[in-house]
């Protein structure tokens, strides 16, 4: 466990390490501090929230509880500008996408790793991502 923590500290950097280690030491406290946005979507919430995302081109991944979409832009600069906007919002939300970029394409997967599945945070970030993409 100590070796894993040392590797994680090196991976996340010194600035984020304190928060990460504090959460590791007291998992109950960090779970208690989570907002209602950080809980799995209920069946009713899925029925209400996911169809709108699917209509916008998002798909549910069958191999894990996550949503995915690929965006295409005019060029790399536009794709990178989009990623920068999303990154700033994700940092504000403390909720970070899995993404991959090659030239003008950006592939995004959203899931809440701390909950092990889709949450309202994922839906809110996906909705922001849609607005950011539409504004370019």
UniProtKB/Swiss-Prot annotation:
N6-acetyllysine: residues carrying this PTM: 120, 124, 131
Keyword S-adenosyl-L-methionine: no
Cellular component terms (Gene Ontology): mitochondrion; nucleus
GO molecular function, one term: phenylalanine 4-monooxygenase activity
Keywords: Acetylation, Lyase, Tetrahydrobiopterin biosynthesis
PANTHER family linked: PTERIN-4-ALPHA-CARBINOLAMINE DEHYDRATASE, PTERIN-4-ALPHA-CARBINOLAMINE DEHYDRATASE 2
Name this polypeptide is given: Pterin-4-alpha-carbinolamine dehydratase 2
Organism from which the protein derives: Mus musculus
This protein's encoding gene: Pcbd2
């Amino acid at each position: 466990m100590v070796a894993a923590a040392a590797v994680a500290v090196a991976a996340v950097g010194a600035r984020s390490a304190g928060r990460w280690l504090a959460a590791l030491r007291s998992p109950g406290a960090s779970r208690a501090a989570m907002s209602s946005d950080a809980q799995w979507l209920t069946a009713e919430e899925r029925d209400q929230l996911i169809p709108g995302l699917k209509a916008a081109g998002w798909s549910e991944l069958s191999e894990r509880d996550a949503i995915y979409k690929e965006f295409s832009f005019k060029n790399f600069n536009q794709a990178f500008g989009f990623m920068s906007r999303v990154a700033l919002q994700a940092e504000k939300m403390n909720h970070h996408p899995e993404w991959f970029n090659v030239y003008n394409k950006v592939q995004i997967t959203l899931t809440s790793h701390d909950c092990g599945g889709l949450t309202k945070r994922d839906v809110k970030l996906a909705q922001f991502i849609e607005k950011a993409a539409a504004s370019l």
